[in-house]
């Protein structure tokens, strides 16, 4: 259940979430219709089979899950059928169908195929920290994260959440850390980084499974390369890769945190998920607050 990536947004802490339990049922995921391509809505964080609990609230943390049902209709299948249909028309009429007729035929084919198309189920989780006003969406895709924010906005009627940004150059800060400048307290370098030329379209160097403070890295820095992604470790609790787009990738919870889970009193799957969410949300908050000051992260207007 642990999140693996974090795309972050800020929102005003003055927002009221007290009615969340009463409004969520109206935004529940409904099955995709026979002639629909997709359906989105909220599902229980504890799984689609759970019908009563559509969110999880622990203190200032709120866990929401957006579920999707998407029809799988490969373009190659549609295009093959379209080619056959157009060939049949050309044989009968002596000329191929025009652009407008071709589009109509394609729409008719899609309309015919949709009820028989396979349905792909997916989910994206989000954690809202109501005290500090940020959303952590479990995806590295900005587009997918925006979809979740849009669903929350539709749910609440208004949700002025904005993508996280910084008042400084993230590349410059990451580069300074790898060059030897002090890191924020409790953070250490990992064993992975990506470096890019300052010029657009320049060389990209990817380093993995190696010490980052070394002669090889220094040579890249000397010729002007800047760090665009950097692996970091928060104590022995969390490892992650921070990008210059402020997306946190490859999020992994380490033994220092997991040991707490092993010693917690959990009885059953639901209790274990509650315990995991409590530990994970606390670590994500600690990480967020640790990065907020040195990176001068944006705040939302209340």
From Swiss-Prot:
Q: Which family does it belong to?
A: Belongs to the RdgC family.
Origin organism is Xylella fastidiosa (strain Temecula1 / ATCC 700964)
What S-S linkages are listed for this chain?
Answer: none
Entry protein name: Recombination-associated protein RdgC
Give the GO biological process terms: DNA recombination; regulation of DNA recombination
For this protein, the record's HAMAP family field holds: RdgC
Instruction: State its location(s).
Output: Cytoplasm, Nucleoid
Q: List the GO molecular function terms.
A: double-stranded DNA binding
Q: Which UniProt keywords apply?
A: Cytoplasm, DNA recombination
Gene name, please?
rdgC
Q: Which domain of life is it from?
A: Bacteria
Q: Give Gene Ontology CC terms.
A: bacterial nucleoid; cytoplasm
Where is this chain primarily localised?
Answer: cytoplasm
Described purpose of this protein according to its UniProt entry: May be involved in recombination.
């Amino acid at each position: 259940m642990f999140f693996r990536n974090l795309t972050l947004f800020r929102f005003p802490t003055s927002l009221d979430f007290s009615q969340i339990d009463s409004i969520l049922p109206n935004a529940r995921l409904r099955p995709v219709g026979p002639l629909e391509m997709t359906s989105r809505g909220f599902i229980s964080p504890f799984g689609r089979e759970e019908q009563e609990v559509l969110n999880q609230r622990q203190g200032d943390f709120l866990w929401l899950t957006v579920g999707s049902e998407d029809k799988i209709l490969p373009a190659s299948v549609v295009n093959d059928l379209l080619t056959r249909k157009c060939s049949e028309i050309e044989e009968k009429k002596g000329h191929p169908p025009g652009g407008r007729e071709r589009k109509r035929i394609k729409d008719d084919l899609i309309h015919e195929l949709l009820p028989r198309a396979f349905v792909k189920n997916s989910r994206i989780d989000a954690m809202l920290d109501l005290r500090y006003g940020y959303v952590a969406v479990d995806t590295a895709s900005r587009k997918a994260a925006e979809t979740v924010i849009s669903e929350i906005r539709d749910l609440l009627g208004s949700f002025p959440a904005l993508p996280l940004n910084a008042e400084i150059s993230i590349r410059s800060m990451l580069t300074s850390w790898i060059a030897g400048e002090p890191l924020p307290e409790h953070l250490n370098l990992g064993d992975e980084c990506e470096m890019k030329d300052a010029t657009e379209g320049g060389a990209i160097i990817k380093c993995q499974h190696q010490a980052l403070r070394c002669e090889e890295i220094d040579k890249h820095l000397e010729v002007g390369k800047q760090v665009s992604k950097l692996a970091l470790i928060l104590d022995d609790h969390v490892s992650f890769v921070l990008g210059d787009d402020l997306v946190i990738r490859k999020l992994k919870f380490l033994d220092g945190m997991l040991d707490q889970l092993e010693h917690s009193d959990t009885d059953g799957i639901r209790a274990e998920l509650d315990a995991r969410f409590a530990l994970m949300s606390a670590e994500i908050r600690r990480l967020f607050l640790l990065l907020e000051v040195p990176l001068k992260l944006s705040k939302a207007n209340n």
